[in-house]
Regions:
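A polyanion-binding, active-site-adjacent surface
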Residues: 1-165
Length: 165
C-alpha cells in the first residue's frame, strides 16, 4: 500500500473490502487534497451500499487520477485494484471508467458481449473474477430525482455476495 501511495495513488477505507468505489472527476475540495468521497456523493454512496446490505466497513475508495488530474497509468490502476482486491469495482464517473477500460483492455476485449466489454453505464461486466459497474456520473445525478432513481437501480445490480449486513 505504501508503494502505491508513493506512486501518487489516493485511496481510503478498508483494504480488502468487497466494494471499491473509483472516481476520477474530483470536486474542487478533493482536488485540493480533501478526502475523496467526503462530500454528498460519498454520503449517498455509503447510504446506498448500507441499504443494499453492505456493512459500513465493506467499501474502500480509489481516485483514478493523480494529483495533477491526469488519469492513472493503466499498469498503476491495475496494480491498485489488484492490491485492494475487491469483489466489486464501482466506477462513479466516466473518467474512472475510462481508466479501468485502459487498465483491463485485454480482458474486456475477450468478453463475448461487445456491449459489456465497453463498460457502458448501468451494465455489470465480470472481469478477472470481479464485478465491474459503471454508474455513469453518480455525483452529477444527485441533483436530479429521476437520475438518483437510475443510480439506485444500477447499484441494486451489485448486492453483497455474502450474507447481508
Amino acid at each position: 500500500m505504501a508503494s502505491l501511495v508513493e506512486c501518487g495513488v489516493r485511496m481510503g477505507g478498508n483494504a480488502f473490502s468487497p466494494v471499491l468505489l473509483a472516481k476520477g472527476e474530483l470536486t474542487p475540495e478533493e482536488a485540493a487534497g480533501a478526502k475523496p468521497f467526503s462530500g454528498p456523493d460519498g454520503a449517498a454512496l455509503k447510504a446506498s451500499l448500507k441499504a443494499l446490505g453492505y456493512a459500513p466497513e465493506d467499501w474502500e475508495t480509489l481516485v483514478a487520477v493523480d494529483a495533477a488530474g491526469a488519469p492513472l497509468a493503466p499498469d498503476l490502476m491495475r496494480l491498485a485494484v489488484a492490491t485492494l482486491d475487491p469483489a466489486t469495482l464501482i466506477c462513479c464517473d466516466e473518467t474512472a471508467t475510462q481508466v479501468v477500460r485502459d487498465a483491463y483492455a485485454e480482458e474486456l476485449s475477450g468478453l463475448e458481449d461487445l456491449n459489456e466489454a465497453l463498460l457502458p453505464a448501468g451494465m455489470v461486466a465480470y472481469v478477472c473474477g470481479m464485478r465491474f459497474l459503471n454508474l455513469g456520473g453518480f455525483a452529477a445525478a444527485l441533483g436530479d430525482p429521476r437520475q438518483k432513481q437510475v443510480m439506485w437501480a444500477r447499484l441494486k445490480q451489485v448486492p453483497p455476495l455474502a450474507e447481508p449486513y
